[in-house]
UniProtKB/Swiss-Prot annotation:
One of its GO terms (molecular function) is transaminase activity. PANTHER family: GLUTAMATE-1-SEMIALDEHYDE 2,1-AMINOMUTASE (PTHR43713), GLUTAMATE-1-SEMIALDEHYDE 2,1-AMINOMUTASE 1, CHLOROPLASTIC-RELATED (PTHR43713:SF3). It is found in: Cytoplasm. One of its GO terms (biological process) is protoporphyrinogen IX biosynthetic process. This is Glutamate-1-semialdehyde 2,1-aminomutase. Its cofactor is pyridoxal 5'-phosphate. It comes from Xanthomonas campestris pv. phaseoli.
Length: 429
């Protein structure tokens, strides 16, 4: 593939943007090489500035569950912008969005719109601290909840990709208020609550870890956390920025049958536009300003164009059988990848929940952060580049989940697996 225009753009970008990108994982530092620059996207495909086409399993890191540039979403945006780009005042679409989320998600009686997943998690934790009168939070190794200071302790996503355990610039006093647990560790959670439970405002968790690749919860684990939080008077926050409306219509909480006190959202509810939200029990959400004393605000929150895009996307995912078909397509991909690796003599296992998946270069079932970080990263990096050269774009880090869309039909998946068979053979050499 020719990447001359991408190469020139990246060289220019590095003189203007830190690392040449506006989000670290995009720079390919984990996998090596240089990123390609995207010119357009359609369906399951990305097209770069050098006119190369890629089957895309990143999907803008999750939002594009119906594929890129879906006509219904595009038309909703085009219609909305005819009426203006931003009002800084209430609009009807905000109400419709809140109604939709509240109807579909078990935990959400009220909703507040924000502009990103990071804003959502920061706001949810502030609400938890204000509502409980406590300061400490518990998070999990490898889970990423945005770049808020409280969350950059043993975080996943770009932090894990770059091998940074805790970011410089986070005051020690603040990081000391964040306790960490190993995901899927029942005994560790019980012991930590026995030690500090009376000080804990909230437990925040990705119910399916998507920022240390894809790690599902063991049977009963989320309910165990629910029980501990209730017993000790702490709030349970599900970060469903990735899992919301993807692993099931009602998110991971509906899929696993565990209802948190608060939930954070992003990605799919914006249809590709910048957006976030948090919601939960009415008695908690009514403590948010101006109804209550816990302050949170945003100039562009509830932006009408973002609401239009998100509502169009949520209409698509409510179509009968949408999530069943998405899960079946993801299973087809994962089973095919394992078969292709096995044929090449490569140790690979996959995890899948609905339309999320993870690819691990190991023989073991991966159920924890420690297992994810023990996988063969060198082989993953070689596989990543072998697939990229064959026109398949996977997440450029061994520590990021993959995302399926409804635009990935059987022919697209078969083309992916044909590329994978060749790529695994390259890795085996």
């Amino acid at each position: 593939m020719n990447h001359s225009r991408s190469h020139a753009l990246f060289a220019q970008a590095q003189t203007l943007l830190p690392g040449g990108v506006n989000s670290p994982v995009r720079a390919f530092k984990s996998v090596g090489g240089e990123p390609f620059f995207v010119a357009r996207a359609d369906g399951p495909y990305l097209f770069d500035v050098d006119d190369n086409r890629y089957i895309d399993y990143v999907g803008s890191w999750g939002p594009m569950i119906a594929g890129h540039n879906h006509p219904a979403v595009r038309e909703a945006v085009e219609q909305s912008i005819r009426n203006g780009l931003s009002f800084g005042a209430p609009c009807a679409a905000e109400v419709t969005m809140a109604q939709t989320i509240a109807r579909l998600v078990p935990s959400c009686e009220m909703v507040r719109m924000v502009n990103s997943g990071t804003e959502a998690t920061l706001s949810a934790v502030r609400l938890a601290r204000g509502a409980t009168g406590r300061n400490r939070i518990i998070k999990f190794e490898g889970c990423y909840h945005g770049h808020g200071d409280s969350f950059l302790v043993k975080a996943g996503s770009g932090m894990l990709t770059l091998g940074v355990p805790t970011s410089p610039g986070v005051p020690a006093g603040l990081s000391e208020l964040t306790a960490t647990l190993s995901f899927n560790d029942f005994e560790g959670a019980t012991a930590l609550f026995d030690e500090i439970g009376a000080e804990v405002a909230a437990v925040i968790i990705e119910p399916v870890v998507g920022n240390a690749n894809c790690i599902p919860p063991q049977a009963g684990y989320l309910q165990h956390l629910r029980t501990l939080c209730t017993r000790h008077g702490a709030l349970l926050i599900f970060d469903e920025v990735m899992t919301g409306f993807r692993v099931a219509l009602g998110g991971a909480q509906a899929h696993y049958g565990v209802t948190p006190d608060l939930t954070t959202f992003g990605k799919i509810i914006g249809g590709g536009m910048p957006v976030g939200a948090y919601g939960g029990r009415r008695d908690l959400m009514e403590q948010v300003a101006p109804a209550g004393p816990i302050y949170q605000a945003g100039t562009l929150s509830g932006n009408p164009v973002a609401m239009a895009a998100g509502l169009a996307m949520l209409e698509l995912v409510q179509e009968p059988g949408f999530h069943t078909r998405l899960s079946e397509a993801t299973s087809m991909l994962c089973e095919g990848l394992e078969d292709a690796a096995r044929a090449a003599g490569i140790a690979v296992t996959t995890n899948q929940v609905g339309g999320m998946f993870g690819l691990f270069f190991t023989d073991d079932v991966v159920e924890s952060y420690a297992q994810a970080t023990a996988c063969d990263i060198t082989s993953f990096n070689r596989f990543f580049h072998a697939m990229l050269q064959r026109g398949v774009y996977l997440a450029p880090s061994a520590y990021e989940a993959g995302f399926m869309s409804s635009a990935h039909d059987e022919a697209v998946i078969e083309a992916t697996l044909a590329a994978a068979r060749e790529a695994f053979a390259d890795v085996a050499r």
